[in-house]
UniProtKB/Swiss-Prot annotation:
<comment type="similarity">
    <text>Belongs to the beta-defensin family.</text>
</comment>
<feature type="disulfide bond">
    <location>
        <begin position="35"/>
        <end position="49"/>
    </location>
</feature>
<comment type="function">
    <text>Has antibacterial activity.</text>
</comment>
<dbReference type="GO" id="GO:0045087">
    <property type="term" value="P:innate immune response"/>
</dbReference>
<keyword id="KW-1015">Disulfide bond</keyword>
<dbReference type="Pfam" id="PF13841">
    <property type="entry name" value="Defensin_beta_2"/>
</dbReference>
<dbReference type="GO" id="GO:0005576">
    <property type="term" value="C:extracellular region"/>
</dbReference>
<keyword id="KW-0964">Secreted</keyword>
<feature type="signal peptide">
    <location>
        <begin position="1"/>
        <end position="22"/>
    </location>
</feature>
<keyword id="KW-0929">Antimicrobial</keyword>
<feature type="disulfide bond">
    <location>
        <begin position="39"/>
        <end position="56"/>
    </location>
</feature>
<feature type="compositionally biased region" description="Basic residues">
    <location>
        <begin position="76"/>
        <end position="87"/>
    </location>
</feature>
<keyword id="KW-0211">Defensin</keyword>
<keyword id="KW-0732">Signal</keyword>
<protein>
    <recommendedName>
        <fullName>Beta-defensin 132</fullName>
    </recommendedName>
</protein>
<dbReference type="InterPro" id="IPR025933">
    <property type="entry name" value="Beta_defensin_dom"/>
</dbReference>
<keyword id="KW-0044">Antibiotic</keyword>
């Protein structure tokens, strides 16, 4: 009976000492990340929470970058134009 009472007292003490967050406190409220010393695999550091801890967020929570939209095949038409200029220069060099 005394052993059971001792175990229960130890468990109660451990619940007060061990944090429930399990890996770090949250970063600021609008960021889906945790303050950690080292980021886990699949995470990146966004900013510093304090001098020794980084705000680590998963790649899936990061905003997607805005990429410019290409209109048609603009890059292919430029490539054809440079090839034509090269052919014209070759014909003028060989005919001279």
């Amino acid at each position: 009976m005394k052993f059971l009472l001792l175990v229960l007292a130890a468990l109660r003490f451990l619940t007060q000492v061990i944090p429930a967050s399990g890996g770090g406190s949250k970063c600021v409220s609008d960021t889906q990340g945790y303050c950690r010393t080292y980021c886990h695999q699949g995470e990146t550091a966004l900013f510093m929470c304090n001098a020794s801890r980084k705000c680590c967020a998963s790649y899936s929570f990061l905003p997607k970058p805005d990429l410019p939209q290409l209109i048609g095949n603009h890059w292919q038409s430029r490539r054809r134009n440079t090839q034509r200029k090269d052919k014209k220069q070759q014909t003028t060099v060989t005919s001279s």
